[in-house]
Amino acid sequence: MKKSIITLFLAVVSVVSCEPPMPPSDEEMIRHFATHEAAFRKVYEIMEESSEGSFHYPPLSPEEVIILDPTEQSDTSHETNDEQDLPVYGLLKPDRLQLDSLLSEIGCGLVLVDRREWETADSVYVSLVMPYYSHGIVDAGTSKSFVYDPGLRSRRNIRITEHGDLNEIYRRMYNDTTLYKPVKEGWYIKLDHSR
């Protein structure tokens, strides 16, 4: 009798533990954004004012960056501060250190920057994607991100919903889905699900 109860218990535990973890609810993400709003806005400010081009930060491949190890015992007395601090995508070392701290505070490991500049209009368009939750593999899984994109509503084929939790919507549809939910002027939650 005890063996059958233990076997049943183990079977239930293994089935329950096989389900993918639930992404954070929209409400949890909105509260998180509100708590760390100043940090999110500072990330945008740094990227808008100091960065160049479209890129991932921190860089995903070591070839994209030259980092001088401050603990290295080499003679750099002949180098100027500019030579010791080579910009990475236009970001100087103080900006990078601040970004590292801000990304840690908001719980996002990286930021994807899409920067577009128009010479004729002297204007810059910057959008950000900051992955917050991810489960699965490259071509099949679920992710939720914080997005800053002031022009998102004007794009075609973008699904923005203001009602219901994105998790529940994609579970009902259960097919490849990309949905956005507004958080605050230009800021969104993005849910990406693919099977």
Feature names for model-found ranges:
Residues 7-15:
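Bacterial N-terminal signal peptides
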Residues 9, 19-23, 164-166:
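Alpha-helical context
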Residues 18-103:
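N-terminal export/targeting and maturation segments
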Residues 93, 104-195:
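Extracytoplasmic electrostatic interaction patches
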